[in-house]
Amino acid sequence: MDIRIKEKPEEFYVKEIKKLDLKEKGQYAYFLLKKKDMTTLDAVRHISHRFGIPLKNIGFAGLKDKKAVTEQYISVKDLNEEKIRKMDGYRTENLELKFLGFSDKGLELGEIEGNYFEVVVRGVTKYHRRVFPRMKELVENYGCENYFGEQRFGSVKHAEEFIVKYLLRHEYEEAMKEYLTSLGDKRLKRLLRKAWRDWDRFLSLMPKGAKPELEVVKALRRGESFKNAFMVLPKNIRLMFVFAYQSYLWNRYLYTFVVRYLKYCKTPFLKWELAFFNDMSEVIWEEIKDLEIPYLGVEYKPRNKKAEIVMKEVLQDEGITPKMLMAERIGIKLFSDGVRKAFFKPQGLKVIEERKNSLKLSFTLPPGSYATILLRKLFCSDVKS
């Protein structure tokens, strides 16, 4: 019994929360960017192309959903007054800009206080209405598991294996085949796999919007090795391979922790499952409320013994050895350590509109937490969008 979101972009609204200290002069001009049915990167590329601004001069604090109406800030370095006038009030069908002021510092990724959401949830059944009040109370009193959401996994949902696993084994051709043929369109996936190593045929079949991937195949056609062809990809795309696998590992740590030590309900998530506590006592919460789980436990050691046991078991089950954690391939480290809070608490969680088969919710989340994860917990249900 899945709930549904994003049936229209207007049904998923996100506004970035950030205190701006702006003035009348400065090296960086700040704009409010409002967009609809468009990724942040596509919006920034459009602005760069339309106004002749180098991409590196445009800063933003986070990537916002595509199928949504979103508001976020961007900073643009070294703009003259004429260009600011042209950009202020600029609008297309999918985006609009509003000039706000200046600063001596540009925006960088992660520099926000949080995100405010208004979301219409459809497909609400009697089961969901029975579950929701109890889960809402648990979330308000305690919190929600801080799993990584779908956005961290890219095309993994259509892949057989994580690309990092192939790279660890130096299987560069298999890694490349997984990357270039993991598509939702099963027929196209089959045709691409059949055309493997016939690069002219392969190029003719590829989606035309896949620019970095097209360049990789052209490099293979020129005779580059599979290993070297990976280097044609921009570093941020290569790093996505790392983020996807590390997000999966971290989600597995938290899932195992919840299933082993707490009362829970499970929901489907891509090709896996997530578990959410559906009961809690003050005594247990006091023990786990500040729990932080490292990504690897190399530089950052787990301070919770139960989390440490779970991490060791998951890494062992995945066949990841301490030596592998130091591995470098295709110009990047395949693993990097850090810590992440196990739980987050949304602010201002409210039902702002109720209909027979739908609810409209509003809430504010801290940076790095996912609305789709919160919705899975609130309804103990998968989320389709």
Curated annotation (Swiss-Prot):
InterPro entries for the chain: PsdUridine_synth_cat_dom_sf, PsdUridine_synth_TruD, PsdUridine_synth_TruD_CS, PsdUridine_synth_TruD_insert, TruD_catalytic
Family matches, as CDD domains: PSTD1
GO terms classed as biological process: pseudouridine synthesis; tRNA pseudouridine synthesis
Active site as annotated: 65 (nucleophile)
Any one GO MF annotation of this record: tRNA pseudouridine(13) synthase activity
Family matches, as Pfam families: TruD (PF01142)
EC number(s) on file: 5.4.99.27
Residues forming coiled coils: none
UniProt entry tagged with the keyword Isomerase: yes
PROSITE patterns reported in the protein's UniProt record: TRUD, UPF0024
Residue intervals of the TRUD domain: 143-345
Name the UniProt record assigns to this protein: tRNA pseudouridine synthase D
Organism: Aquifex aeolicus (strain VF5)
Lineage, highest ranks first: Bacteria, Pseudomonadati, Aquificota, Aquificia, Aquificales
